[in-house]
Amino acid sequence: MLSKRVIVCLDVRDGKTTKGIKFKGNVDIGDPVDMARVYYEAGCDELVFYDITASHEKRGIMIDVVRRVAETIFIPFSVGGGISSVEDMRDVLLAGAEKISVNSAAVKNPKIITQGAEAFGNQCVVLGMDVKKVEKSEKIPSGYEIVINGGRTYMGIDALWWAQEGERLGAGEICLNSIDADGTKEGYELELTALISENVNIPVIASGGGGIPQHLGDVLKEGKADAALIASMVHYGTYTIPEIKDHLKSQGISVRDQLQ
């Protein structure tokens, strides 16, 4: 049985790690390089770095920060935000990331998924999906709609269709973020996560809403996710990575042991 992964997300604005609720009210909480080192040493399985302003404000990825973070940790590391071309992908991978995450750019230009997969391999391309629950309709039969630009723009695209299309185009993994749950610490969107996980053949990372260790247990079991992304619950010192993993083990969930 493959071990489930605990992934820490570092949202970065203007070179500082930040955290908001439903993409609003962001406050600075620390230096991303220092925080990356802390989480790596604590035993997180992967790290995700998002330049959360890059897509909206059309700024390039902060390559220097990416390089310094990648030099600090020795676990898989993905980078997203402002990546809109194969050249952007190459720059980030050369800076030290193992994976690149495309979200808004892929919605606007789906070919970027295929181009990235062909250039660097499927395993390097993560399809980031920001999703909001809406009324079911002929256009959005699943009741979950794709939004972009930090949740500001509704795209009229059904989330289930887009997940399957992303896989067909070459994405090797999906990072599925519920805007409704993001930052609330009230639990992941289990229905959404299970819907996507059951209907694609690539790993799904659940994102948005983790507040207590049991929330991870729920989404890894009921939501059938392959990994859970966390931020608030560790950024503010509420829980540690070892505490979270110990809880998951107590639930019969296979997780990787901390590196010694």
From Swiss-Prot:
UniProt keyword annotation of Amino-acid biosynthesis present: yes
The UniProt record lists the keyword Lyase: yes
Main location: cytoplasm
Family from the record: Belongs to the HisA/HisF family.
The EC number(s) this enzyme carries: 4.3.2.10
Catalytic activity line of the entry: 5-[(5-phospho-1-deoxy-D-ribulos-1-ylimino)methylamino]-1-(5-phospho-beta-D-ribosyl)imidazole-4-carboxamide + L-glutamine = D-erythro-1-(imidazol-4-yl)glycerol 3-phosphate + 5-amino-1-(5-phospho-beta-D-ribosyl)imidazole-4-carboxamide + L-glutamate + H(+)
Known function: IGPS catalyzes the conversion of PRFAR and glutamine to IGP, AICAR and glutamate. The HisF subunit catalyzes the cyclization activity that produces IGP and AICAR from PRFAR using the ammonia provided by the HisH subunit.
Top-level taxon of origin: Bacteria
Annotated GO CC locations: cytoplasm
Residues annotated as the enzyme's active site: 11, 130
Subcellular localization, as worded in the UniProt entry: Cytoplasm
One Pfam family, short name: His_biosynth
Pathway note: Amino-acid biosynthesis; L-histidine biosynthesis; L-histidine from 5-phospho-alpha-D-ribose 1-diphosphate: step 5/9
Name of the featured protein: Imidazole glycerol phosphate synthase subunit HisF
Keyword vocabulary terms for this entry: Amino-acid biosynthesis, Cytoplasm, Histidine biosynthesis, Lyase
An annotated Gene Ontology molecular function: lyase activity
Higher taxonomy: Bacteria, Pseudomonadati, Thermodesulfobacteriota, Desulfobacteria, Desulfobacterales
Annotated GO biological process: L-histidine biosynthetic process
UniProt xrefs under InterPro entries: Aldolase_TIM, His_biosynth, HisF, IGPS_HisA/HisF, RibuloseP-bd_barrel
Self-association state and partner proteins as the record states: Heterodimer of HisH and HisF.
